[in-house]
Amino acid sequence: MACQIQASRVFPVLEIEKGLSFMINVFHRRIKASSITLTSFPYPMKSFQIRRPNRKIAFALDTGSSIPGDSGEGQEMNGDRTGLGSTRLGRIAIAGGKQLLGKINSARKNFPMKIFLLLLGFYTANALATILGQTGDWDVLVAGIVVAAIEGIGMLMYKKPSSSMFSGKLQSFVVFMNFWKAGVCLGLFVDAFKLGS
């Protein structure tokens, strides 16, 4: 008896239908015998489909507050009473994700310049440690100047913002100097480890 069995599998697919309902096609098999052809299981195919009406997709990387619907309009996340946004923990997670993405997007501004200043600060610390290690006469004076510069930049960077103290360009300059300061601190930290070993 020759019997031919052919099975085909459709991988789980997430489809969005009208009304934002989910349909998950779990699998579909087709068995063919020589004289008998079965096109489905004894149960209808609808038993393998899971429908969840009124569900909305929460995108992890979306910074907007709306989800595009079928008509292209946005629907507010605050009105969502199902899914992640329905609990207090979900709302905290969504707000934290939006804040994190905002900070990541603001850090991307002038990213090459920030990396350059970080590496320049690292090089400055290595040059200071090498030159001052050779002479040995200026150690205390230069260490005091470096500490004063680091503390001054930190004071300008992290003090409470006043109404019109800084213009935009001066604030940007202080942010860039803060990256240079971070490079100097990192370089001195690495040199201290080299001397300790």
Swiss-Prot record:
Keywords: Membrane, Transmembrane, Transmembrane helix
Protein's recorded name: Ycf20-like protein
GO cellular component, one term: chloroplast
Membrane topology of the entry: Multi-pass membrane protein
Pfam families: DUF565 (PF04483)
Membrane-traversing stretches: 113-133, 138-158, 173-193
Recorded family membership: Belongs to the ycf20 family.
GO biological process terms on file: nonphotochemical quenching
Keyword ATP-binding among record annotations: no
Record flagged with keyword Membrane: yes
Predominant localisation class: membrane
Localization terms from the record: Membrane
